[in-house]
Each structure stands twice: as C-alpha cells, then as structure tokens.
C-alpha cells in the first residue's frame, strides 16, 4: 500500500486502484490518474455503499467492499434498511448520564425487513452488475467466508427464508454474475 494513505481508502491487492465512499456512493481512483470516477449514484442513508450507513457525512468514508485477489473485481453486499422502523435502547453505562440509542430493527410480524442486493464491480471498465440473488420473500443474505484472494472467480453466499425453514448455499461466478446453488 502507498505510504501515509488515508484510512478511508480501500486498495486493490496490487495497489493499482483504491475505492472510497462519499455521501453513500462509491468512487474509484486509478493509480495513474488522480481524478476520481463515480461508480454509483443510488447510495443513500440506510441503503449505502459505505460502512457509515446511518450517518449523513460530508466526509470521505470507508467503503463496504471486498476486493478479489486478482484486483479485477470487488463486491458490495448492500442492506436496504430504509423502510424498517426504529428501535431504542437505553445505554445505562453512558457517562455522565444514560443515553437513548436508536437503531433500525425489524420486529417479528412487521411488514418491512432488511433486504439485500449484491453488486460486482469491474474497475478496469468502471462497470458493475447487480447479481440476481432473490429467491425467497424477505430473505436474509450473508456472504460466506470465501477465498477471493486465491480463488477470485467464486464468491459464496447463503440466503435464508424469513421463516428460517429454507436455506441455500450459493456460488457466484464473479466473471459473469451467474448464481449457482451448491
């Protein structure tokens, strides 16, 4: 990695690209060019490409992405929490007085829950695709510990029905975006 890099940059394994988030969208920096390229325009609070999903910051932030070992692709699993209601908890350990903390949390039986979409980005062409991961209504999606460092062609995820009675292990071909149930 280049020396003295800002903490909010995520570098590709070969250090030829770096990614950062600004106002919930992704920006690409090429090592040969100092002009950032905006990769996304649909990021917003509670539906962000940034790790700072709940804040409206005017500062550059760390992106919620993972690079493949070959530096040819990276992915972002986005969680849409815009319609989910707020939940509150009292932080009794806060100093000097307890504080009320707010976060998004879907309660059992509520209509709206978190939804997910998986994006694959190709920095060489500045293109990206949205992978079709939908199968169950209101499904939960998690990335499984994939070895993108040594096997950059395969990304694994699980999808689970809201009732938790069905679950699939799936493989994504990162070159095409095709999904295969394992």
Please state what every model-predicted region is.
Residues 39-64, 76-130:
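Predominantly five- to eight-bladed beta-propeller fold
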Residues 4, 11-14, 58-63, 102-105, ...:
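Short alpha-helical segments and helix-capping/turn motifs at coil-helix boundaries
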Residues 31-34, 122-126, 174-177:
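Short loop/turn segments that connect beta-strands within beta-propeller blades
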Residues 26, 36, 74, 118-120, ...:
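Hydrophobic beta-strand positions in blades of beta-propellers and related beta-sheet-rich domains
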Residues 5-8, 62, 96, 141-143:
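Conserved positions at the start
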Residues 127-131, 135-161, 175-176:
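Long hydrophobic segments that form regular secondary structure
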Residues 15-25, 30, 63-66, 75-81, ...:
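Beta-strand C-termini and the immediately following turn/loop, strongest in propeller blades
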Residues 1-46, 53, 136-138, 153, ...:
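A conserved hydrophobic secondary-structure block that centers on an alpha-helix together
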């Amino acid at each position: 990695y280049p020396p003295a890099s800002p903490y909010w940059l995520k570098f590709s394994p070969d250090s030829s690209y770096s990614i950062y988030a600004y106002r919930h969208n992704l920006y690409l920096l090429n090592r040969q060019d100092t002009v950032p390229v905006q990769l996304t325009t649909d990021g917003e609070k509670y539906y962000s490409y940034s790790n700072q999903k709940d804040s409206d910051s005017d500062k550059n932030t760390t992106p919620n992405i993972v690079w493949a070992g070959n530096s040819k692709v990276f992915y972002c699993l986005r969680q849409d929490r815009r319609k989910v209601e707020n939940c509150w908890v009292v932080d009794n350990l806060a100093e000097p007085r307890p504080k009320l903390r707010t976060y998004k949390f879907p309660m059992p039986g509520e209509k709206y829950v978190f939804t997910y979409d998986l994006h694959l980005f190709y920095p060489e062409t500045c293109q990206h695709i949205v992978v079709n991961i939908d199968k169950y209504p209101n499904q939960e999606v998690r990335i499984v510990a994939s070895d993108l460092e040594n096997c950059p062609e395969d990304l694994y995820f699980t999808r689970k029905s809201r009732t938790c009675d069905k679950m699939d292990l799936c493989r994504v071909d990162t070159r095409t975006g095709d999904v295969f149930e394992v």
